[in-house]
C-alpha cells in the first residue's frame, strides 16, 4: 500500500533542496512510497528574474542531489518565482 514518507525523510528532502544557493524556498512537497519505489514532487521558489533555462538547470541540479540520497526516487520539480505562494512555503 502506498504511504507518505516519514517526517525525517521529508525533512531530509527539504534540506537537500534548500542547500542549493539559488533555491530561496520550497512548497507543496508531496511524497509517497510504493514498495521500494519513492515518488517525490515539490515546487522550488527562485528569483523571478532568472531565465527559464537557469531555473530549469537549478531544478535539475536539485533533482540530481535528491536522487543521490534517494536512488529509488522518481522526482518531479516545478519551478516557481519566490513569494508566489505566500504562507504555503516550506511545506
What do these predicted ranges mean?
Residues 1-91:
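Alpha-helical transmembrane segments and adjacent TM-loop junctions that form the membrane-embedded core
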Amino acid at each position: 500500500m502506498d504511504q507518505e514518507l516519514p517526517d525525517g525523510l521529508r525533512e531530509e528532502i527539504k534540506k537537500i533542496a534548500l542547500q542549493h544557493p539559488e533555491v530561496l524556498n520550497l512548497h507543496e512537497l508531496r511524497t509517497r512510497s510504493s514498495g521500494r519505489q519513492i515518488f517525490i514532487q515539490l515546487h522550488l521558489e527562485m528569483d523571478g528574474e532568472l531565465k527559464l533555462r537557469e531555473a530549469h538547470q537549478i531544478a535539475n541540479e536539485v533533482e540530481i542531489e535528491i536522487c543521490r540520497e534517494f536512488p529509488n526516487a522518481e522526482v518531479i520539480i516545478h519551478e516557481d518565482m519566490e513569494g508566489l505562494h505566500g504562507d504555503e512555503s516550506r511545506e
